[in-house]
């Protein structure tokens, strides 16, 4: 019976290898096959523990190759799968962030493993502005600019001026964002609503002036909840704009235009950038007027999944796992 079990497993492994094109040599590093101890209480093998995450043989092998030796040894010796293994069930979990996931989960035990991975990937286990990462591809439509990702002072995208019918001031956007905004504004007009730009591109120096004005008025702690520091503003990308207003006192969220945008912005490639209930992820208060162009595919996924841009980026496959 034991030989039959081994034979069946070998055939299954051979089929998996043939289908994936993975070489036997690539799998030498992961303990494969059923445990010699077939009793009900037998410790699961590393392969079994990884496959229990829903990974294929190829995916399990690739993940095993990324694990540092102490983590591998923990799997070899475990009578039960270690808790940190639950993070790796998600293809957006980074192996080199396992220590951070564990530490953050200890500090936030109420979170699920998925929430832990997403929030650490966003950077929430570290204070904002403390060690920002430079935005590597500032021209990307989904470039993440926030309290953890900074644009260089001299970054200026390609920009075009908005026609007077679509703005209340002389202003600029990236060409692709402007074209999409025109289509969206025209569609809203067909429904009897007017949406227009109130504030679009801001240079580094302009954002510096805006932020310092708020700091003088209310202090840095308060300003940081609704105004970006210079270099940390999406407005510098030329992909963000404030629609119809940029004031909390106007209560844009109560307008018909806001309701229309919530339902339709994604069709044109825009997302509500700082939604209500996601302040702990974005770092900013709810801003019903602030929209960001990310392209139709990303915008629709964010709308369908109720994700912020932070969550969208945090859920992209980790290196070696796509």
Put a short name on every predicted segment:
Residues 22-199, 204-322:
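Extracytoplasmic cell-surface/polysaccharide-interacting catalytic and binding patches
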Residues 2-25:
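Sec-dependent N-terminal signal peptides of Gram-positive bacterial secreted proteins and lipoproteins
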């Amino acid at each position: 019976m034991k030989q039959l079990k081994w034979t069946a497993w070998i055939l299954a492994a051979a089929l998996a290898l043939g289908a994936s094109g993975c070489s036997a040599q690539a799998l030498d590093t992961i303990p494969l096959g059923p445990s010699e101890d077939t009793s009900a209480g037998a410790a699961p093998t590393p392969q079994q523990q990884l496959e229990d995450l829903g990974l294929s043989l190829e995916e399990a092998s690739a993940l095993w190759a990324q694990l540092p030796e102490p983590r591998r040894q923990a799997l070899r010796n475990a009578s039960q799968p270690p808790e940190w293994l639950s993070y790796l069930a998600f293809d957006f979990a980074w192996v080199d962030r396992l220590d951070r996931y564990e530490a953050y989960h200890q500090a936030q035990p109420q979170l699920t493993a998925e929430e832990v991975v997403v929030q650490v990937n966003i950077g929430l286990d570290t204070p904002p502005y403390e060690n920002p990462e430079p935005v590597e591809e500032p021209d990307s439509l989904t470039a993440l600019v926030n309290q953890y990702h900074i644009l260089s002072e001299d970054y200026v995208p390609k920009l075009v001026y908005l026609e007077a019918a679509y703005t209340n001031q002389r202003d600029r956007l990236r060409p692709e964002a402007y074209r999409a905004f025109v289509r969206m504004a025209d569609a809203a007009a067909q429904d009897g609503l007017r949406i227009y730009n109130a504030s679009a591109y801001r240079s580094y120096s302009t954002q510096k002036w805006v932020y310092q004005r708020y700091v003088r008025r209310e202090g840095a702690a308060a300003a940081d909840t609704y105004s970006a520091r210079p270099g940390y503003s999406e407005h510098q990308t030329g992909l963000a704009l404030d629609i119809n207003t940029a004031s909390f006192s106007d209560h844009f969220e109560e307008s018909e235009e806001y309701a229309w945008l919530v339902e339709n912005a994604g069709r044109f490639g825009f997302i509500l950038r700082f939604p209500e209930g996601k302040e702990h992820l974005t770092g900013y208060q709810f801003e019903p007027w602030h929209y960001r162009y990310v392209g139709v595919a990303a915008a629709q996924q964010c709308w369908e999944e109720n994700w912020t841009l932070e969550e969208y980026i945090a859920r992209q496959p980790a290196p070696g796992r796509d």
